[in-house]
From Swiss-Prot:
<feature type="active site">
    <location>
        <position position="165"/>
    </location>
</feature>
<keyword id="KW-0378">Hydrolase</keyword>
<dbReference type="InterPro" id="IPR033694">
    <property type="entry name" value="PGPEP1_Cys_AS"/>
</dbReference>
<keyword id="KW-0788">Thiol protease</keyword>
<dbReference type="GO" id="GO:0005829">
    <property type="term" value="C:cytosol"/>
</dbReference>
<dbReference type="InterPro" id="IPR036440">
    <property type="entry name" value="Peptidase_C15-like_sf"/>
</dbReference>
<feature type="active site">
    <location>
        <position position="80"/>
    </location>
</feature>
<dbReference type="InterPro" id="IPR016125">
    <property type="entry name" value="Peptidase_C15-like"/>
</dbReference>
<dbReference type="GO" id="GO:0016920">
    <property type="term" value="F:pyroglutamyl-peptidase activity"/>
</dbReference>
<dbReference type="InterPro" id="IPR000816">
    <property type="entry name" value="Peptidase_C15"/>
</dbReference>
<dbReference type="Pfam" id="PF01470">
    <property type="entry name" value="Peptidase_C15"/>
</dbReference>
<protein>
    <recommendedName>
        <fullName>Pyrrolidone-carboxylate peptidase</fullName>
        <ecNumber>3.4.19.3</ecNumber>
    </recommendedName>
</protein>
<dbReference type="GO" id="GO:0006508">
    <property type="term" value="P:proteolysis"/>
</dbReference>
<dbReference type="InterPro" id="IPR029762">
    <property type="entry name" value="PGP-I_bact-type"/>
</dbReference>
<comment type="similarity">
    <text>Belongs to the peptidase C15 family.</text>
</comment>
<comment type="function">
    <text>Removes 5-oxoproline from various penultimate amino acid residues except L-proline.</text>
</comment>
<comment type="subunit">
    <text>Homotetramer.</text>
</comment>
């Protein structure tokens, strides 16, 4: 039995829901053959986010960590390729922190790559008709903060980990005319991502880059 830790954020920025948390709640109640799914709610708070996930890692000892976050304006599921060592918050987090041009970990490197097979994930979802593309920027808010912090602590351990951004839910997007994706599609996509991560030892080699 392999363990998968799924993390989703609490609502922030005036929203009443966060699609990442709704998705994690849905997935935690589902069953996949030979897979135990563990859900974890993450505060949108600097450093507390990292501590919450690392505590869950130590408690559950998962084989795979999939961190999920909301990306307003994106129309596809986007596996993040790289986390950068920078906090530069455009808005306050849920505890009122708003660091500007500060490192996440002062002694850490400039960046960490995801250890997920991001190209295999993208190909699998695209083949299933689910919009998915690799992203090369997780932003500079708490999503990137968590992504970098977890990669920093897990990069020497045999635990695959990475970050996935997802679009808004339709009920969030309707008022602002932004792209959205149904929870049903997100659930199907996340199931495929988990299976791909657990079954793919080495990522596929095909172009996934961008011009700019």
């Amino acid at each position: 039995m392999r363990k998968v830790l799924l993390t989703g954020f609490e609502p922030f920025g005036g929203e009443s829901i966060n699609p990442s948390l709704e998705l994690v709640k849905q997935m935690a109640s589902r069953a996949l053959p030979q897979v135990e799914i563990i859900g974890c709610e993450v505060p949108v708070v600097r450093y507390q986010a990292i501590e919450t996930v690392l505590q869950a890692v130590e408690t559950h000892q998962p084989d795979l960590v999939l961190m999920i976050g909301q990306a307003s304006g994106r129309c596809a599921i986007t596996p993040e390729r790289v986390a950068i060592n920078l906090d530069d918050y455009r808005i306050e987090d849920n505890a009122g922190h708003q660091p500007v041009d500060e490192p996440i970990i002062a002694t850490g490197p400039a960046a960490y790559f995801s250890t997920l097979p991001v190209k295999a994930i993208t190909h699998a979802l695209q083949q299933a008709g689910i919009p998915c593309q690799i992203s090369h920027s997780a932003g500079t808010f708490v999503c990137n903060h968590l992504f970098y912090g977890v990669q920093h602590h897990l990069h020497t351990r045999a635990i695959r980990s990475g970050f996935i951004h997802i679009p808004l839910l339709p009920e969030q997007a309707s008022a602002s005319n932004q792209p959205s994706m149904s929870l049903e599609t997100l659930v199907h996509g996340l199931e495929m991502m988990m299976i791909t991560c657990l079954e793919t030892e080495q990522d596929t080699k095909h172009t996934g880059g961008t011009i700019c």
